[in-house]
């Protein structure tokens, strides 16, 4: 009886360890981009969390709009709010413009293709609107 319990303990311990490592190992943060695609990141920044409107072109080149835009992340040092749209697309010829209206006094938009900043605009004033259009 003691031998059976000892064997079960010796068997269960390594199996449990392997299963715990498999279950609790970190997952990949994001899947790898498909070959021939570009990762597009559009970032909106404001001094207010809740803002007016945002307009951008999606992965298929369709114009998208959103009103009452909430920004989810606040930078601890600058106290500015920001949010990013991230998608992949194949065609570099699709439009890549963005527009953002703040309810505060600062509006900023940035467009990144892969890791290259292709457009940015910062406007200050009363309910400013920033416009991003890639430089050619």
Where are the language model's segments positioned?
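N-terminal secretory signal peptides that target proteins for export/translocation
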Residues: 1-6
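Bacterial N-terminal signal peptides
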Residues: 11-22
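C-terminal region of N-terminal signal peptides and the immediate post-cleavage residues
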Residues: 21-36
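Short, surface-exposed binding/anchoring microloops in extracellular/periplasmic proteins
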Residues: 32-63
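Short, charged, intrinsically disordered terminal tails
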Residues: 33-35, 130-136
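Mature extracytoplasmic domains of secretory-pathway proteins
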Residues: 51, 56-103
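Extracytosolic low-complexity repeat regions of secreted or lipid-anchored proteins
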Residues: 83-133
